[in-house]
Amino acid sequence: QLMSWVFDGEKSPDKIEIETSDQWRTITDEDESYAIWIGHATYLINNGDINILTDPIFSKRASPIGFAGPKRMIPPVMSMKDLPKIDVVVVSHNHYDHLDMYSLKKLYKINPETIFLVPMGDKKRLIKAGLTKVHEMRWWESMEVARSTIHFTPVQHWSKRGLFDRNKSLWGGWFFETSDLKLY
């Protein structure tokens, strides 16, 4: 069976249909807290204070080159043009499906005032791409943005973007806190 799988070209299981929703279009109160799954690890979060985007990937492939690499199976539920003004973008680690330079550059072009929070070791890549408000975070570091505190926490994972850079930068999770809401 293994040989059949290898030689017959069946590389992935049957596609699973995932129903997406456009209910996000009904959100009208900008002060209302919400989280919208856009796709993969990308969430749009409004914590009643700021708009946060996590690990934005809007590309068709997660790869250093646009024509090869893992292809997106499910399109994002909203496009970048549908997004509200993004105050903060957080990146959990530097794998191509979480740190998508195409998406980050486009978000920066839409709003150069966006703050980008990245793990220690990844700032240089974003600065080289022309982004300006980039802050590196170590584990347990926090940053105040408006009335929100954003904490960078350790998680069990790793970082790697090339052949020889395994764990040369940090990776982690994000904890968002206001006086009314705590979200991990």
Predicted regions and their residues:
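Binuclear metal-ion centers of metallo-dependent hydrolases, dominated by the metallo-beta-lactamase
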Residues: 115, 130-146
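Short, polar loop motifs at secondary-structure junctions
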Residues: 39, 119-125, 138
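Catalytic core of the metallo-beta-lactamase
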Residues: 42-48, 144-184
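Metallo-beta-lactamase
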Residues: 1-71, 76-82, 177-184
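Short amphipathic alpha-helix with an adjacent loop that forms part of the alpha/beta core around
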Residues: 77-85, 143-147, 165
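Active-site metal-binding motif and surrounding structural segment of the metallo-beta-lactamase
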Residues: 67-118, 133-135
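Active-site environment of divalent metal-dependent phosphoester hydrolases
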Residues: 95-99, 123-125, 141-144, 158-160
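Divalent metal-coordination and catalytic microenvironments
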Residues: 45, 55, 93, 116, ...
